[in-house]
Regions:
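N-terminal helical cap/lid subdomain that shapes the substrate entry/recognition surface
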Residues: 7-115
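Asp-based, Mg2+/Mn2+-dependent phosphohydrolase catalytic module
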Residues: 1-13, 118, 122-125, 129-250
C-alpha cells in the first residue's frame, strides 16, 4: 500500500530492533526450547511456547515500556504464566533467577540479524541516509544485541531507559530524529508492530511509519495491536526489509 504523504524529503531512518533488524522471535524460540526441556513436563513444542511468549496476553512487557513494571518483574510474570499454561512449577524468586540465567544465556546465543537487514543498511549508506535504533529495551542491552548480531554500524540512539518510558511515547521518536540531526518531518520509522511503531511514529510527527509485517510472524496472529484493514495516513506495510528503500523512494 503506498504512503499517502510525501516521503521525498526522508533523510533519516529510525529502526526498531527486535523482530525488525534482529530475528528475536528465533532467539526466543531457542531460549524457550532450552528452558522448556529443563523445566516443563513432557515433550516441548517450541513453536507453541514462542507463540505464547510473544503474544504476552496480559501485556506485561508493554507495561514495562510504560514505566509501570520493572524489567525483572515483567519477565518473571511471563515465565510463571508460561509455566502455568504448560504444566511447569510456580517459581519463587530463587527458582526464577536460575530459570532466567538459563533463558538469558540461550537467548543471547540466538541473536542474529535478519538476512535482509545488512542489504538495507548498505542501500541506506549508498543513498547517504542516516540511520539509528530506537527500542523499548535498555540502551546497553540493545547495543550488545546489535553488536552480537553483526550490526555494529547501527547507532543505538534511544531506549526505554532514556526517558523511563518507551514507544509509543512521542519523545522517543523525536529524540531519535534529533540525535541523527534530522527534523521529524524528514525521518521515517521502521518496525514490526503497527500500533507502537508505524502509527506511533506518524503520530509523533515523523514523515512516515513503515510496518514490517513478515508472513506468519504476527504476535498471536494479530497486527501488533492494531487493525490492519486501514493503516492510516503516513503508514506503509511491507513484508520484508528488502522493500523498505523502495517504499521510501530511495
Amino acid at each position: 500500500m503506498p504512503i499517502t504523504t510525501d516521503v521525498s524529503s526522508v533523510r533519516a531512518v529510525l529502526f526498531d530492533i527486535d523482530d525488525t533488524l534482529v530475528d528475536t522471535r528465533g532467539a526466543f524460540r531457542h531460549a524457550l526450547a532450552v528452558v522448556g526441556e529443563r523445566h516443563l513436563p513432557g515433550p516441548v513444542d517450541a513453536d507453541a511456547l514462542v507463540a505464547t511468549w510473544r503474544a504476552d496476553v496480559n501485556g506485561w512487557y508493554r507495561a514495562f515500556a510504560r514505566g509501570e513494571l520493572g524489567y525483572r518483574e515483567q519477565r518473571m510474570r511471563r515465565a510463571n504464566e508460561l509455566h502455568a499454561l504448560y504444566g511447569g512449577p510456580v517459581m519463587d524468586d530463587a527458582a526464577y533467577d536460575a530459570w532466567d540465567a538459563e533463558f538469558e544465556a540461550a537467548f543471547r546465543e540466538g541473536w542474529v540479524a535478519h538476512v535482509d537487514a545488512v542489504p538495507l543498511l548498505d542501500a541506506l549508506d549508498l543513498a547517504g541516509v542516516a540511520y539509528g535504533a530506537v527500542s523499548n529495551a535498555h540502551v546497553a542491552y540493545q547495543r550488545d544485541k546489535l553488536d552480537r548480531a553483526g550490526l555494529e554500524r547501527v547507532p543505538m540512539l534511544v531506549g526505554v531507559d532514556t526517558f523511563g518510558v518507551g514507544k509509543p511515547d512521542p519523545r522517543v521518536f523525536l529524540e531519535g530524529a534529533r540525535l541523527l540531526g534530522a527534523e521529524p518531518a524528514s525521518a521515517a520509522y521502521v518496525g514490526d508492530e503497527l500500533d507502537i511503531d508505524a502509527r506511533a511514529a506518524v503520530a509523533a510527527g515523523l514523515a512516515c511509519g513503515v510496518w514490517v509485517d513478515r508472513p506468519q510472524t504476527r504476535r498471536d496472529g494479530h497486527a501488533g495491536g492494531g487493525d490492519a484493514s486501514s493503516l492510516g495516513d503516513g503508514v506503509v506495510r511491507v513484508e520484508r526489509l528488502a522493500d523498505v528503500a523502495a517504499a521510501l523512494g530511495l
